[in-house]
Each structure stands twice: as structure tokens, then as C-alpha cells.
Amino acid sequence: MRRIILASASPRRKELLRQLIGDNFLVSPSSYEEPPQPDLAPEELLIRHSIGKARDVAKHFSSGIIISADTSVLYNGEVLGKPNFPEKAEEMLKKLNGRKFRVVTGLTVLDLDSAQEISESESTDVWMSEMDDEQILAYVRTGEPLDKAGAFAAQGKGAVLIERIEGDFFNAVGLPLFRLGKILEKLGVSVFDESFS
């Protein structure tokens, strides 16, 4: 069995990877600093960040497969990252209220044994339902929107805010499992392997 290393401290990514391959992976959060690169398209920027995270974690291992991801919400040409205080979460939710937006993830899988690195992006369209100001504030008060791209959690209480999703639901949570499975297959790793059960 190949050693799998998740380059993320995100509880959501850990849980999604666990659904795919069980508990057979290590968690090694990256300390990569995301430099501002305003000239890049958002998809390219997220891929660059995922590459940076994977390569940062690779410094600590000589063997294994490193998985890293970077997710943001795109609305009207603006990249909405993770709000770190309630007022910012409220502002983001008011922008997305009753509108369609896109969740984009840059995904990198780095095979240290073969020196292969595969990076791709995944996009998911999301339609948020309309909420009044009190509903937005009530959701913000739960604390759930903090530290979530776009200030919502599709897998938590935020699920009731989502009217419709087109594309990979798991991408909207932070790790596109379909694309990840296909990349692992390219590297000779099957999620159906008995060692992952």
C-alpha cells in the first residue's frame, strides 16, 4: 500500500479523504504562504497554491503521495476566500444571497516515488437561496461561516442555504473526490484497493 499524505489541516478535507480511502493516510499541514498574484486567472492561482502546498510538505517526506488543494468562491469576477471575522462573513453572504456563484478548487497530487506531479482544477456552480438579513445574521452567529471559502459550509447548516448545485458536490466542500480518484488512477493507485477499506 502506498503512503498517502494530506497536505491540509482542514477537517472537511480529512473527512472527505477518509470517505474515499479510509483512515490510511497521514495529515501534514503545509506552511506554504500564498503570495498575491493578481495577474493570474483564479483557476491558475488556485492550482499554483495547491502546487506550493504539496511541494512544501514534500520537503518532509522521501516517499508517498501528497494531496493538496486550495478552494475559493468566485462571484462576479471577485475571489471570495475565507472570512476570519463575522462582519466579513456577513458581507460575503449578502453578496452571494439569491445568486449563482462558482466554487473552484486547485488540486495537486505529487507522487514522490515517481516524481510525477498532476495539478488540475475543478469548478462547481452553486445557487444560494434568498435570505433576509436576520437569517444571514443567524447563520453567521452559528460560527460556521468563519474559515470557510465564501462563508458557507455546504455539508453543514449551510446546506439549507443551497438551492442547487451543478457539478461535484464534494468540490463545494473543499476536495473534488471524482477528480482526485481519477488522478490517483493515473498514478496507479485505485481507491477500490482492499488496503483502503
Swiss-Prot record:
Disulfide bonds: none annotated. It is an enzyme of class 3 (hydrolase). Nucleoside triphosphate pyrophosphatase that hydrolyzes dTTP and UTP. May have a dual role in cell division arrest and in preventing the incorporation of modified nucleotides into cellular nucleic acids. It holds the Pfam family Maf. It catalyses: dTTP + H2O = dTMP + diphosphate + H(+); UTP + H2O = UMP + diphosphate + H(+). It comes from Methanosarcina mazei (strain ATCC BAA-159 / DSM 3647 / Goe1 / Go1 / JCM 11833 / OCM 88). InterPro entries: ITPase-like_fam, Maf-like. GO terms for biological process: nucleotide metabolic process. Belongs to the Maf family. YhdE subfamily. The active site is at D70. The record marks R12, T71, Q155 as: Important for substrate specificity. Keywords: Cytoplasm, Hydrolase, Nucleotide metabolism. It is found in: Cytoplasm. Its main location: cytoplasm. GO terms for molecular function: dTTP diphosphatase activity; UTP diphosphatase activity. GO terms for cellular component: cytoplasm. This is dTTP/UTP pyrophosphatase. Gene3D superfamilies: 3.90.950.10. Its EC number is 3.6.1.9.
